């Protein structure tokens, strides 16, 4: 098997569009009030372990909000410290729009091998607390907005995403547009 584009595409379907907006709160307002996405679930301090950015350990701290827009998960990320990360670099470079897309996969090692075969570069990687999963972000050289996140999470995480999506389907578009944010 080779890491051809067709092989990479078979790893999974895009389930998330992620942004690292200049103004996190304005982005939440845009997605909830203009686009009808939500409700969003805000986490002030995302817990990740064993973070590496471009192969070096990093103590990134960031906030995240996740909501659904139909079947697509929308993720907003706000870097909260100056530690090296692709999120910090995105903001430092003044980039706007989609930062990365995410696929849920079953085997990180397999995805990593296919990424290497296709000439992709793993630019950031994280483990979830307790070793229950993880993610890596690969750059295939397509420019801003073309980074792919490969995420492996346990069934409980998938169930959580399904519950968020169901809340979106049942949501009135007004009540509690952002859950967990003061």
What do the PLM-derived regions correspond to, one by one?
Residues 1-15, 19-41, 54-121, 132, ...:
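Glyoxalase I/VOC metalloenzyme domain signal
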Residues 41-45, 126-127:
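Conserved catalytic-core motifs of GNAT/GCN5-like acyltransferases
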Residues 46-47, 129, 157:
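Residue-level detector of flexible, active-site-proximal loop/helix-junction positions
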Residues 47-55:
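Short, charge-patterned binding micro-sites
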């Amino acid at each position: 098997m080779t890491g051809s584009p067709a092989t990479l595409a078979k790893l999974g379907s895009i389930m998330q569009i992620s942004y690292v907006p200049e103004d996190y709160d304005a982005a939440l307002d845009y997605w909830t009030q203009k686009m009808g996405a939500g409700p969003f679930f805000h986490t002030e301090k995302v817990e990740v372990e064993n973070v590496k950015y471009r192969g070096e350990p990093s103590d990134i701290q960031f906030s995240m909000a996740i909501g659904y827009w139909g079947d697509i998960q929308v993720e907003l990320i706000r870097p909260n410290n100056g530690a090296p990360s692709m999120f910090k670099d995105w903001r430092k470079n003044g980039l706007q729009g989609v930062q990365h897309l995410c696929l849920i996969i079953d085997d990180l090692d397999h995805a990593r091998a296919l990424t290497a075969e296709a000439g992709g570069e793993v630019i950031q990687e994280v483990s979830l607390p307790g070793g229950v999963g993880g993610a890596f972000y690969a750059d295939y050289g397509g420019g801003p907005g073309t980074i792919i996140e490969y995420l492996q999470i346990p069934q409980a995480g998938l169930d959580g995403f399904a519950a968020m999506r169901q809340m979106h389907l049942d949501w009135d578009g007004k009540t509690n547009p952002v859950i967990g944010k003061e």
